Amino acid sequence: MEWLWLFFLHPISFYQGAAFPFALLFNYLCIMDSFSTRARYLFLLTGGGALAVAAMGSYAVLVFTPAVCAVALLCSLAPQQVHRWTFCFQMSWQTLCHLGLHYTEYYLHEPPSVRFCITLSSLMLLTQRVTSLSLDICEGKVKAASGGFRSRSSLSEHVCKALPYFSYLLFFPALLGGSLCSFQRFQARVQGSSALHPRHSFWALSWRGLQILGLECLNVAVSRVVDAGAGLTDCQQFECIYVVWTTAGLFKLTYYSHWILDDSLLHAAGFGPELGQSPGEEGYVPDADIWTLERTHRISVFSRKWNQSTARWLRRLVFQHSRAWPLLQTFAFSAWWHGLHPGQVFGFVCWAVMVEADYLIHSFANEFIRSWPMRLFYRTLTWAHTQLIIAYIMLAVEVRSLSSLWLLCNSYNSVFPMVYCILLLLLAKRKHKCN
């Protein structure tokens, strides 16, 4: 069972596991109605601060600083201006931190500190919460702190008004991972009584534990296959397709395990899907919809379901506000948000092109393929093609060296995205003629 210990000794998994008892304690105290709303905000904020210091060490200041600045902007700016300024500041700060990682990896050729990598991951999640909250304020979904820091209220009153914002940005169940929780859901959970029955919560968490166990068993089996076979540097021709597919499968299994663990921590604290929702409130969106991800034959569906809460956040933040080339802008911003490593830039641009091709290809197929056997054959073929393209994109995004990216581009795996590129050009030309 050493492999199971390796999962829980993974830096983020370890700290997420350490936070579990405190998440259960918070939920229990809410069920018992044992402490006030302000005490709940303080509990979540203090837990977030302690977890940040434990996991990140001195790098925690890189998360605390933008959180404090974001709250200052949220409380001092007019609702119409708040999103522009918070977005610019947050992405500038995150980009500077990512440049530090680039300097370490590409200039010094040194492996980055594990604590620094955890900090960057947490900072990316903080960017999601900051921009989500600023958009809510800008759109009138959340009422900004009245008066803000410009009013003549005392310091203690300012702090009390800003406490929900601080707590939301740094609350410990979502500090290191987990689906994006809107400020409305967060506030409703903290201010209301828990809708989570202890027995139901126990079975839900047990089911998630079994899922993690099963995924880790698969992870071990696939990793042994990958280790026993050739790598991307020494594979030959069609063998490279198998290498990329199995390696991408290993990445996916790892993502699924960690997403379910993150989801379990949120659920243990009472922020899971069983929470009662007020009218018009956005529901809980889990990141790991494994069933849909593994059976879909459409790249566009995979894109919407992969890391689902982040996909929705990107759609709201970029896609819905883009006037020209919204799809390309969304994936380009995703590459920026992830850190602009060469593989990420290539991978996300390729992903955008594949989604655009996917729309045209399936629209054309639905128009001309009528018989049931042909539809089944078409669905099977496009499922396999989708899985191979996703594997190609995933490896491009995950590799850090230009040499590895070059090997991937020169392998037979490049045939699959090239087929979609050719079909995109042909179908786009046909669509233009029809119009």
UniProtKB/Swiss-Prot annotation:
Expressed predominantly in stomach with moderate levels in pancreas and relatively low levels in most other tissues. Catalyzes ghrelin acylation at 'Ser-3' using preferentially octanoyl-CoA, hexanoyl-CoA and decanoyl-CoA as acyl-CoA donors leading to ghrelin activity. In vitro also uses acyl-CoA donors of different lengths from short-chain (C2) to long-chain fatty acids (C16) knowing that acyl-CoA donors from butanoyl-CoA (C4) to dodecanoyl-CoA (C12) are more efficient compared to longer acyl-CoA donors, such as myristoyl-CoA (C14) and palmitoyl-CoA (C16) that are not efficient. The active site is at residues 307, 338. GO terms for cellular component: endoplasmic reticulum; endoplasmic reticulum membrane. This is Membrane-bound ghrelin O-acyltransferase MBOAT4. It comes from the Eukaryota. InterPro entries: LPLAT_7/PORCN-like, MBOAT_fam. It is a multi-pass membrane protein. Monomer. The keyword Transport does not apply. Keywords: Acyltransferase, Endoplasmic reticulum, Membrane, Transferase, Transmembrane, Transmembrane helix. It holds the Pfam family MBOAT. GO terms for biological process: lipid modification; peptide hormone processing; peptidyl-serine octanoylation. It is found in: Endoplasmic reticulum membrane. One of its GO terms (molecular function) is acyltransferase activity, transferring groups other than amino-acyl groups. Residues 1-5, 57-59, 102-120, 228-240, 339-340, 398-407 are lumenal. The keyword Transmembrane applies. Not glycosylated. Belongs to the membrane-bound acyltransferase family. The gene is MBOAT4. Residues 27-40, 77-82, 137-206, 262-324, 358-376, 429-435 are cytoplasmic. It catalyses: octanoyl-CoA + L-seryl-[protein] = O-octanoyl-L-seryl-[protein] + CoA; decanoyl-CoA + L-seryl-[protein] = O-decanoyl-L-seryl-[protein] + CoA; L-seryl-[protein] + acetyl-CoA = O-acetyl-L-seryl-[protein] + CoA; L-seryl-[protein] + butanoyl-CoA = O-butanoyl-L-seryl-[protein] + CoA. It comes from Homo sapiens. Changing residue 46 to A: Does not affect octanoyltransferase activity.
